[in-house]
Amino acid sequence: MPEVQRMTLTQFLIEERRRYPDASGGFNGLILNVAMACKEIARAVAFGALGGLHGKASNQAGEAGAVNVQGEIQQKLDVLSNTTFLRVNEWGGYLAGMASEEMEAPYQIPDHYPRGKYLLVFDPLDGSSNIDVNVSVGSIFSVLRAPEGASAVTEQDFLQPGSAQVAAGYALYGPTTMLVLTVGNGVNGFTLDPNLGEFFLTHPNLQVPADTQEFAINASNSRFWEAPVQRYIAECMAGKSGPRGKDFNMRWIASMVAEAHRILMRGGVFMYPRDSKDPAKPGRLRLLYEANPIAFLMEQAGGRASTGRQTLMSVAPGALHQRIGVIFGSRNEVERIEGYHTDQTDPDLPSPLFNERSLFRASA
């Protein structure tokens, strides 16, 4: 049998551009540069310990244990991935600036390179704590429009709601490397052919099922959850004998890219909600380069993304590294959790069902 003729990422972008006769082509160039950065990172991840890239990054004193702006220990691959994104994307003339999880301030395009009309924000290596144990990690990115006429970008230029995104996506470095992308017209998945070095369209028009029996949450934080989340998880754990009348499965990988990918493939709901573990942090995940890109993908695939109180893409950012509570996935489940937040009368009073029937029963 003849091989299936698959569309390459380049061909896909050309087809998308044909829908907009006035488009300049610069956007396509930007996405292809992002894809190139992801290819380089995929290669580094694949070599693992053979490439000497496992373990913690060194600080200025040459000691293992460098810390980024988030106060998190950097892995060697965090640093390499960030450098790769900057190097591959700064020269093309498509960007006015970049911002990264690993950098405190926006990155200015060097003067000897032309400036473009877009902004790129990214988490160069999500889930990097999983590197040394060989669990899937990924890169997340979002494309925004830059303000016209500015000679240098500022933090304020990046503080746009998720609804302003031009494109978003992630690369998953797992058994295969995949690039999952939205340009505002659905969600499509591309698989990297390691022999040709090309991404091919393998998962067109991804759709998140509206219903699910699977949820992902870090249950070790259960004592810090707000009442609506406690109620939802308790009902799921009660299974067929509870108010939902069906059994649920729980998943947790500690890599949001891997969690999001599973949900895009087969449905589910992911929760890293606001909690009381650290009152100084209203959430764990970062709005601009983690929550918003995944929210755009979920909404474009028929799912939903929320804080529990409002849609993620309607949140007005207040800072480059702003953290936020995140709930996304199958639409009906996310809307149910939102409804529980709406019904909440006392934020400090958990549902009785949580204590009576949950596996995470509070101590007497």
Curated annotation (Swiss-Prot):
Binding site residues for substrate: 126-129, 218
CDD domains recorded: FBPase
Sequence positions that bind Mg(2+) 1: 101, 123, 125
GO molecular function: fructose 1,6-bisphosphate 1-phosphatase activity; magnesium ion binding
The enzyme's E.C. designation: 3.1.3.11
Taxonomy, superkingdom: Bacteria
Keywords of this entry: Carbohydrate metabolism, Cytoplasm, Hydrolase, Magnesium, Metal-binding
Keyword Flavoprotein tagged: no
Catalytic reactions on record: beta-D-fructose 1,6-bisphosphate + H2O = beta-D-fructose 6-phosphate + phosphate
Cofactor names: Mg(2+)
Pathways involved: Carbohydrate biosynthesis; gluconeogenesis
Chain sites annotated for binding Mg(2+) 2: 123, 126, 290
Compartment annotation: Cytoplasm
Cofactor: how bound: Binds 2 magnesium ions per subunit.
Pfam families linked: FBPase, FBPase_C
Entry-linked InterPro entries: FBPase_C_dom, FBPase_class-1, FBPase_N, FBPtase, Fructose_bisphosphatase_AS
PANTHER family given in the database record: FRUCTOSE-1,6-BISPHOSPHATASE-RELATED (PTHR11556), SEDOHEPTULOSE-1,7-BISPHOSPHATASE, CHLOROPLASTIC (PTHR11556:SF35)
Similarity section: Belongs to the FBPase class 1 family.
Subunit: Homotetramer.
Name assigned to this protein: Fructose-1,6-bisphosphatase class 1 2
